[in-house]
Amino acid sequence: IGLNNGMYYTCAEGWQRYRGFARIGMRYALVMVKNPEKPVFLQKFGLRSRVRASAALGAFRSDDYLLNQIYDMCRHTHELCVEDTFTDCPTYEQAFWIGDAQISSFINGWVCGDYDFLRHNIEIGATALKNTPMMNALTPTDWNTSIPMWAFNWITAIQEYERMTRDSSLSSRLYPTIREVMAYYIGCMDARGGLLINGWNMLDWAALDIHNNCVVTGQQALFAYCLDYAAGLAEAAGHSEDAVLFREKALVLRRYIDKVLWREDVRAFADGWTPEHGLSKTVSTQTNTLLTLFDGILDPEKKRITLGYIEREPEAFIRAGSPFFLFYVYEVLVAQGRLKDVLEDIKLRWGEMLRYDCKTCWEVFPGFYEVSRTRSYCHSWSASPTYFIHRYALGVERAADGFDGIRLHPVDVNLGWCEGSIPTRHGRIDVRWSREGGKTRYHLRVPVAIRVDAEQMASCELIVERI
């Protein structure tokens, strides 16, 4: 871990050649010659570029030039952050953070279709349990640091892998590890049902009033969601007692959210609670997003109020501070039928990176740091626009695990036409749609093994070609 993007070479007499052993990420290279006793001549200086081989079956193109540029920038970023595992960046750390890898796996599944590689990353992620029962935030490493949300992200990545591939063998084999993680965090619940964690309680790079010894509201909802998923795995494996326990604890967690973490003075859920300070002073989009996305609210009225805050953010709420957390915000907005808003926001925020003539996505947005634009200029968690474009703008919805079935639907976005390809375990789906003369024309090439539901396409001119 560290900024290891330089090297020293001590010259001998005469012509010689040298190739560095360490992988270095860069856009520009600076050569410095120190203390020469005579002129130094460079005959050749170059870079040897290398990325992991990929199926790379996905593609996208549209009549929106800026959106195309952003898609290419994000896809290139993802490719540069793929080594023997997903890494956060090719320069600053080159580390396999298991929370970052969740977003990378969603991107790769929809854009590249490297399913064996997704499985490999999940298996490597399981080794994070060797450092600490909380799961280390990155692995393999001797730096012991845990972020609870990263452990829960590893579990949701397993769930998405199953949905992409219909392969349940991985979750079955990893169930003992999942059970161990769930049991540890259940042990962190206090008498009232709060997940009181003493650790790095990070949700986002933003000024949330949460502490290292804290019940974090969004984290509480995500843990309840993971317990429900683990209960399903337990039932499938014949561990009925585990399933009952996990579901009971998930309900306790949600009741705690409802009874303890609601701030009646602002009619919103607090970002957290600490034994020293009580309820947090801040309320945020981050908390509302995780509560909504992971079904953390029991009370129907509080759920309605929270959805209203997502539809129209109050001024006093803290906004998402990083490309990382916008992944979750965008998922909720798309579920509300606001894909058009999501794509326009992507063009605004990622378009700002393009204005600086960048070819890759930054870790944070311009303005986050006072004295620099960003820390990492090529960061995998910032490549999620490729995922949203692929999954939602093409009008193809996965209707069954493993893409055994898909559902077609018209797309409400500011595009005149777009085309693209989606990888599946049955083969590639090719899509092209356009709006001409007030009519939407939709052309689909789809493997014969995939069922197609086109009930929502009655107003469109539809051609389905089986391959």
Regions found by a protein language model. Name each.
Residues 1-88, 100, 116-117, 121, ...:
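Extracellular/oxidizing-compartment recognition motifs
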Residues 1-4, 112-212, 348-369:
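Helix-terminus loop motifs that line ligand-binding clefts
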Residues 5, 11-14, 83-85, 132-153, ...:
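The feature captures the catalytic groove of carbohydrate-active enzymes
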Residues 29-34, 99-128, 155-168, 286-297, ...:
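Alpha-helical support elements that line or immediately flank enzyme active sites
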Residues 36-43, 65-67, 110-123, 129, ...:
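Structural helix-adjacent loops and short alpha-helical linkers that scaffold large soluble proteins
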Residues 74, 104, 167, 223, ...:
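Conserved hydrophobic/aromatic pocket- or pore-lining residues that grip, position, or stack substrates
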Residues 236, 255, 340-467:
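Non-catalytic C-terminal accessory modules of carbohydrate-active enzymes
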Residues 280-374:
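Extracellular polysaccharide-recognition and catalytic grooves
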